[in-house]
Amino acid sequence: MVVLGVDPGSLHTGYGVIRYDNAGFHLLGCGVIRLHRRKSYFERIGEIYRELDSVIGGYAPVRLALETVFLNKNVQSALKLGQVRGAVIALAMNHRLELSEYAPREVKAAVTGRGAASKEQVAFMVTRMLKITGNPATHDVTDALAIALCDLLKTGMGSAAVPQSVVSSGSAGKKNWAQFVQSNPGMVVR
């Protein structure tokens, strides 16, 4: 199962492609589509569409997952983000991909066990789950990878690859999360 995760933005759109099989999660590719402010907004949407179209052509995902709109006080920003998401959704439909969307807290909870996790905690868990050495380029990339991982976990495709302590819920999950943090003090961002 190959999933493309997309973290849409009008200036930076992150993407990550993950395959899950019996051996676990495999990072196939990731990156950031960086757009110039000098280009018109319509040109930027077109560039996002073309770049992601190329990613889909190269990796042949069967699913596309993206984050739901984060409500912002700036109405113009929210509208622009909605238009970018619309282009990504149209692209997914043109390629006949299965499409899912997840709230930011849902993505964080799926990957870290905590819906209020910081971007640094999400990035750390993504690098651990995908066995990435070094530092991924940006939070746009790790957020997109987290969205793809969330999709695999939520659809049941990748749940066998994650330690139970990360995905458990209720008081047992809190205890396991506390144990995890205690065992890994270098991961805690204060």
Swiss-Prot record:
<dbReference type="GO" id="GO:0006281">
    <property type="term" value="P:DNA repair"/>
</dbReference>
<comment type="subunit">
    <text>Homodimer which binds Holliday junction (HJ) DNA. The HJ becomes 2-fold symmetrical on binding to RuvC with unstacked arms; it has a different conformation from HJ DNA in complex with RuvA. In the full resolvosome a probable DNA-RuvA(4)-RuvB(12)-RuvC(2) complex forms which resolves the HJ.</text>
</comment>
<dbReference type="GO" id="GO:0005737">
    <property type="term" value="C:cytoplasm"/>
</dbReference>
<feature type="active site">
    <location>
        <position position="140"/>
    </location>
</feature>
<dbReference type="InterPro" id="IPR012337">
    <property type="entry name" value="RNaseH-like_sf"/>
</dbReference>
<protein>
    <recommendedName>
        <fullName>Crossover junction endodeoxyribonuclease RuvC</fullName>
        <ecNumber>3.1.21.10</ecNumber>
    </recommendedName>
</protein>
<dbReference type="GO" id="GO:0000287">
    <property type="term" value="F:magnesium ion binding"/>
</dbReference>
<comment type="similarity">
    <text>Belongs to the RuvC family.</text>
</comment>
<dbReference type="GO" id="GO:0008821">
    <property type="term" value="F:crossover junction DNA endonuclease activity"/>
</dbReference>
<keyword id="KW-0460">Magnesium</keyword>
<feature type="active site">
    <location>
        <position position="67"/>
    </location>
</feature>
<keyword id="KW-0479">Metal-binding</keyword>
<keyword id="KW-0378">Hydrolase</keyword>
<feature type="binding site">
    <location>
        <position position="67"/>
    </location>
    <ligand>
        <name>Mg(2+) 2</name>
    </ligand>
</feature>
<dbReference type="InterPro" id="IPR002176">
    <property type="entry name" value="X-over_junc_endoDNase_RuvC"/>
</dbReference>
<comment type="function">
    <text>The RuvA-RuvB-RuvC complex processes Holliday junction (HJ) DNA during genetic recombination and DNA repair. Endonuclease that resolves HJ intermediates. Cleaves cruciform DNA by making single-stranded nicks across the HJ at symmetrical positions within the homologous arms, yielding a 5'-phosphate and a 3'-hydroxyl group; requires a central core of homology in the junction. The consensus cleavage sequence is 5'-(A/T)TT(C/G)-3'. Cleavage occurs on the 3'-side of the TT dinucleotide at the point of strand exchange.</text>
</comment>
<feature type="binding site">
    <location>
        <position position="7"/>
    </location>
    <ligand>
        <name>Mg(2+) 1</name>
    </ligand>
</feature>
<dbReference type="GO" id="GO:0003677">
    <property type="term" value="F:DNA binding"/>
</dbReference>
<keyword id="KW-0233">DNA recombination</keyword>
<keyword id="KW-0963">Cytoplasm</keyword>
<dbReference type="Pfam" id="PF02075">
    <property type="entry name" value="RuvC"/>
</dbReference>
<keyword id="KW-0234">DNA repair</keyword>
<dbReference type="GO" id="GO:0048476">
    <property type="term" value="C:Holliday junction resolvase complex"/>
</dbReference>
<keyword id="KW-0227">DNA damage</keyword>
<keyword id="KW-0540">Nuclease</keyword>
<dbReference type="InterPro" id="IPR036397">
    <property type="entry name" value="RNaseH_sf"/>
</dbReference>
<keyword id="KW-0238">DNA-binding</keyword>
<feature type="active site">
    <location>
        <position position="7"/>
    </location>
</feature>
<keyword id="KW-0255">Endonuclease</keyword>
<dbReference type="InterPro" id="IPR020563">
    <property type="entry name" value="X-over_junc_endoDNase_Mg_BS"/>
</dbReference>
<dbReference type="GO" id="GO:0006310">
    <property type="term" value="P:DNA recombination"/>
</dbReference>
<feature type="binding site">
    <location>
        <position position="140"/>
    </location>
    <ligand>
        <name>Mg(2+) 1</name>
    </ligand>
</feature>
